[in-house]
Amino acid sequence: MHALMRLFSDYTLQNVVLGTLFLGLGSGLVGSFAVLRRQSLFGDAVSHATLPGIVIAFLLTGTKSTEILLLGAALSGLVGTVVMLMVMRTTKIDTDGAQGIVLGVFLGFGFLLLTHVQKSPQAAKAGLNKFILGQAATILQRDVLLIIAMEVVIGLLVLLFWKELKLSTFDRDFSAVQGFSPQLMEFMLTALIVVAVVVGVQAVGVILMSALLTAPAVAARQWTNSLRVLCALAALFGGVSGVSGSVVSAQVPRLSTGPVIVLVLTGIALVSIMLGPQRGVLYQLWRRRRVSLLQEEG
């Protein structure tokens, strides 16, 4: 107990835990709607699309200020989103295809730029590699405040437009009849996903950020059919994984926080898939076995 208290008294760990806690809460919440809308790959595409913006922001300004780099990430993510929409509306390529194109092209371009930076005299002070898999230990107090502020905004917007988001997610036509704009809700959800991705890339990285959006919702879906409960569970799973991953990585030297958070989330998702009521693998096996026995007795 004393060792745990001493661990949490560490200033760096306090920042990391608070940052990843709120990041997990917000990502789990907004990711629930993305999963229900079958847009899981969208978060993946946006997170990968942020990499070129991060590198370009550094090349243009010569600074590795978190605010500047995240601004570049946000602009690049928005460009990637616009490209996806244009591809879907002007070609016969479906949603998954458009998202896959953006994911591959932007990630490849980002790595090309990153290679260029690493070969330049500025490479030693760039520190851009941390955005690939994340480096939560570099989070400062101002970064934590930014994460908290953005995740609180996400939570408030979801609460404020709960009815509209719910209707547009499950029945777009009925939502339009009720006077709500499905397109507006889709735009808002897209913006929230971009915000969640941008504030999370420093801690989790562009490669793994999509897992923080989808895994909590996938795990929560195994336990409930209620949207309200699903969102609450997804936020809880995201927050727990953030705190757990931060503590574990702090205890083990040279262990990156982002991958550990994703591993914890993967464990939660696997347990949920196996043990979830009604949907769980074990429940389905037990149900089939029971039906088989009843048929044999009959």
Swiss-Prot record:
Top-level division of the source organism's lineage: Bacteria
Ubl conjugation as UniProt keyword: no
Membrane topology: Multi-pass membrane protein
Disulfide bridge positions per record: none
Localization: Cell membrane
Entry keyword Transmembrane: yes
Keywords: Cell membrane, Ion transport, Membrane, Transmembrane, Transmembrane helix, Transport, Zinc, Zinc transport
GO cellular component: ATP-binding cassette (ABC) transporter complex
Transmembrane segments: 16-36, 41-61, 68-88, 97-117, 144-164, 187-207, 229-249, 255-275
GO BP annotation list: response to zinc ion; transmembrane transport; zinc ion transport
Pfam families referenced in this protein's UniProt entry, alphabetically: ABC-3
Purpose: Part of an ATP-driven transport system TroABCD for zinc.
Family statement drawn from the similarity comment of this UniProt entry: Belongs to the ABC-3 integral membrane protein family.
Protein name: Zinc transport system membrane protein TroC
Organism: Treponema pallidum (strain Nichols)
